[in-house]
């Protein structure tokens, strides 16, 4: 790996800093993007915008026969997006965060499907969320190991 000093021949403290001339691979660039705080905050913001779009469609839903698709799709995507943003903050997912996300997903589906919180979930059931929980836990462990090595 070849490095080039920032300032050649100068006796300042900047001369000790080296910049790698090797271009970053696609995997390294994507990893840097996904681990950035701006990306994680962006996920939460996009999720909130999708939930707001759902509320806008809900107002005009009375004029459509099959308006549930106009309401449900952005709302579910928004809730999932918010949960992904919450889970990915700080690089790892604590059990408390995962419990919070499960509650948000289950409650939002309950409200979206019939307007009542009555555990009539069809998408975000306990079985499915527990299956996803294993994946979230393994990804969280992997991310925390990556953060420790950096």
From Swiss-Prot:
Keyword Membrane: yes
Recorded superkingdom: Bacteria
Subcellular location as annotated: Membrane
Transmembrane segments: 41-61, 67-87
Statement: the UniProt record of this protein carries the keyword Membrane: yes
Main location: membrane
Entry GO CC: outer membrane
A Pfam family annotated for this UniProt entry: CRPA
Record keywords: Membrane, Transmembrane, Transmembrane helix
Membrane topology label: Multi-pass membrane protein
The protein, known as: Sulfur-rich protein, serovar D
Lineage start: Bacteria, Pseudomonadati, Chlamydiota, Chlamydiia, Chlamydiales
Gene behind this protein: srp
């Amino acid at each position: 790996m070849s490095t080039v000093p920032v300032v050649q021949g100068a006796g300042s403290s900047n001369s000790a800093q080296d910049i790698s001339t090797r271009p970053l691979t696609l995997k390294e660039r994507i990893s840097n993007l996904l681990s950035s705080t701006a990306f994680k905050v962006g996920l939460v913001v996009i999720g909130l915008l999708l939930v707001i779009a759902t509320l806008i469609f809900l107002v005009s839903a009375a004029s459509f026969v099959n308006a549930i698709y106009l309401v449900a799709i952005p709302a579910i995507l928004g809730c999932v997006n918010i949960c992904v943003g919450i889970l990915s903050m700080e690089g790892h997912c604590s059990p408390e965060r995962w419990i919070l996300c499960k509650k948000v997903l289950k409650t939002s589906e309950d409200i979206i499907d019939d307007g009542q919180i009555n555990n009539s979930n069809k998408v975000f059931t306990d079985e499915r969320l527990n299956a996803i929980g294993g994946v979230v836990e393994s990804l969280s462990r992997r991310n925390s190991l990556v953060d420790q090595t950096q």
